[in-house]
Amino acid sequence: MVYDIMDYDIELWDIVKKEINRQERHIDLVASENYISIQAMKAQGSQLTNKYAEGYPGKRYYGGCKYVDLIEQLAIDRAKVLFTAEYVNVQPHSGSQANFSVFNALLDPGDTILGMHLYHGGHLTHGSKVNFSGKLYKTIFYGVDKFGCIDYEQLCFLTERYRPKMIIGGFSAYSGIVDWARMRRIADSVGAYFFVDMAHIAGLVAAGVYPNPIPYAHVVTATTHKTLAGPRGGIILSNGDNDIEFYRKLDASVFPGSQGGPLMHVIAAKAVAFKEAMHVDFKRYQKQVIINSQKMAKEFLNNGFTVVSGIPYNHLFILDLTNHYITGKDASLVLERANIIVNKNCIPNDSHSPFITSGIRIGTAAVTRRGFNDNDVQEVARWICNILNDISNEKIILNAKKNVLDICYRHPVY
């Protein structure tokens, strides 16, 4: 029997090899991406993928679940310790599905939700009209002030005026510190649920280098990739004062409410990632992620670029390219020619569509994972500045690409 994909399916393996090579030879500055460990990859590629296990540990609809019960409970217990949570559900297949489960558990169609506007740093699942959250619920948005910081006065005003049933904290493109306690007080003023999506900062929170929202929110969701550097997937957490009925609602909204059988091989990989995140090396890594983010942002500022929200306090920041007369789309395309990967991103009150944008989002979780230090990322920022200051200059692009290949060779992914 042939066990190796390279021997069985040469056509597929050829494509996979090209992607592996691309990852090794490109600098990944996409804030939502990271590199999973070999150990977690092995768990995800194990025989656990063969097992169907609808239900929860001890309450399955299938036989033969003795060992997958132990694996899921291990993942739950580790996440509880890691995030100081009373309740954890590790079954959501993604962050978006975790968010859907929270909405489905706590809201009725037509209820009002108040979330951060997509252009100001929010996420599609926080009320965008192209997403279920904007189609099933009445959506109101808060944003950032002229300094790029969350406008809490606007948030308070909108809360009093529209009395939402849920206020959403969290973001996909915001680089400041969020005052979770203040947001909870605002939610409490109208009896609203306070729900936090910490998908982007879960690793930072686990390491204790960014404020933990769990003591303040009714419910929190996260992804297990991004800064947590685990497999692609979602989790739901809560410190709901041991409100068993509240936890049951959340569980029922995941299964059977929105999913069938959980992906046991992915849950095993989540368990590995949670163990890794408990190690002292993980905290050092997350500290360096923020150091690298701040170092890059300062380099851009020193070169005349605009950084939305100023110096970042997490792993990401947005470059506003308006004063350089470049769209985010053009910037991302020209940088990719130099083997530097970013994503185009809207800026507050953007005049361009999300397909074009006036900015790019830069994240340091992945490059830090492969060993880039603050001097390395400062160099990378300089190369980006050189390219964006003269995007038609082929010599600059080729020189940057040469430098990228050299630094990637010195810092392999695996």
UniProtKB/Swiss-Prot annotation:
Matching Gene3D superfamilies: Aspartate Aminotransferase, domain 1, Type I PLP-dependent aspartate aminotransferase-like (Major domain)
Cofactor(s) essential for the protein: pyridoxal 5'-phosphate
Pfam families: SHMT
Alphabetical list of InterPro entries matching this protein: PyrdxlP-dep_Trfase (IPR015424), PyrdxlP-dep_Trfase_major (IPR015421), PyrdxlP-dep_Trfase_small (IPR015422), Ser_HO-MeTrfase (IPR001085), Ser_HO-MeTrfase-like (IPR049943), Ser_HO-MeTrfase_PLP_BS (IPR019798), SHMT-like_dom (IPR039429)
EC class name: transferase
Gene Ontology terms for molecular function: glycine hydroxymethyltransferase activity; pyridoxal phosphate binding
Residues that coordinate or bind (6S)-5,6,7,8-tetrahydrofolate: L118, G122, H123, L124, S353, P354, F355
Site (Plays an important role in substrate specificity): H225
Pathway, per record: One-carbon metabolism; tetrahydrofolate interconversion; Amino-acid biosynthesis; glycine biosynthesis; glycine from L-serine: step 1/1
Cellular component annotations (GO), alphabetically ordered: cytosol
Any single biological process term in GO: tetrahydrofolate interconversion
Catalytic activity, reaction form: (6R)-5,10-methylene-5,6,7,8-tetrahydrofolate + glycine + H2O = (6S)-5,6,7,8-tetrahydrofolate + L-serine
The keyword Transmembrane is assigned to this record: no
Sequence similarity: Belongs to the SHMT family.
Subunit structure: Homodimer.
Protein name: Serine hydroxymethyltransferase
The species this protein was found in: Blochmanniella floridana
